[in-house]
């Protein structure tokens, strides 16, 4: 009887699992029969494991509710979610590469039931393995648009002596000046979060990985940021002794004894880190601290706890205390963004999210002053906030807690509000917008694509709970958001940009077939993100110093303090902030 009725239920459009009968079923079957269908769905959810029917039912429900909510939001004013498709990876870590492709990496799943923990945090041996894929947006949305780029096989000190693809789950990462991604730390598979000493580099030009010398200490949940000289600073993280044994050692990659990799051909292999004279005592409650290099050349470390706030000088190797954040509490996984500052690099950071009870946002200046800014509609954790080409901010994703979407731990059912985006304009005003398809909290991510769209992905629990075909190899999902500026008329055109590296404080020429439409030129840093952490964000205007026919002369930023060396997306904008598609440029 159960199987026969379940088959009938699949033919009916889905709605939320809230214990009530669906209106369309009541109309077609009568109240009593409709309620029977509701009970069947609840029984299916209670069966051993998590059924395929439950996943399809949940995805259909989310699709319907998304359409209902988003009918109220006009794309011209709020933007729209345009695409939703499956991917082969959970994308707990992502990076927007200067080749135009997106690197997705995470772990081999331990569980398909989203009411259980799917990550291998406490799994020894070869089952604790990493995986990685490239998505090429130019190839569309099918399986052929993805390429597997398996990390190097190696042995980690977990006592098993078993080789496996490097378990870089819960590592930290940032870009090197040559466009490569440095990945540091990972998961040893015991102790609730024991940090590996792994040091890897992904080369987007050859689409391959290289292994470097182990770090001095193991790190699980570290943060990494690029200093103005192009070297990466690695801070915090739990050691190889497990959760609660965080390290205060700051490491630098590459070590000062090795050159900074500016050229594409200089691939770091077997390169060591070295340690700074100063430490970073973020403590056990400040995993994945936010790190940002501001235009004074210092790296600002903003811990989860209100008192763990410092500015690090990477040249003098010193640390300066900053005032405590005014909220006075511990903030969990929330976002932070270096705010645009016109023609110069950022000199302030906006801290937001990480506290479900506090919708306020907090701005820290490089002078060490805090001020409360305008609040968002509600508090949320696990959110991702991005800088857009028009200098507005976009928040996607969010949850009530780490694996809690408003209905208890490991319950995939989500409060609708956590699916709604929020945007912040130049005046600092926030407004709620359309809803994404999936709730996405812990391990969710987002990046701005070179065409101005936003890729939203991550959260393996929700991806498993809403997988339309759990037995295939496409257990992740991606959705694409089109900001409002993509619905406000024709776009400027950027046709040519210099191929070689640009020098600071000099002018360079770009070509456009729409010169009269161009009012502004901006740089937007590509980002690499995980766990609501995105240390590479940056937005900078470039002065237009000369116009001649279809050519524009643009003024490069004054120094590496304003724009650390590396690759950036260059956009041309019209008077309404509508951007062109980007061209890649590099600075050194």
Feature map (PLM): residue ranges:
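Secretory targeting and sorting signals
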Residues: 1-16
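Kelch-like beta-propeller repeat domains
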Residues: 17-588
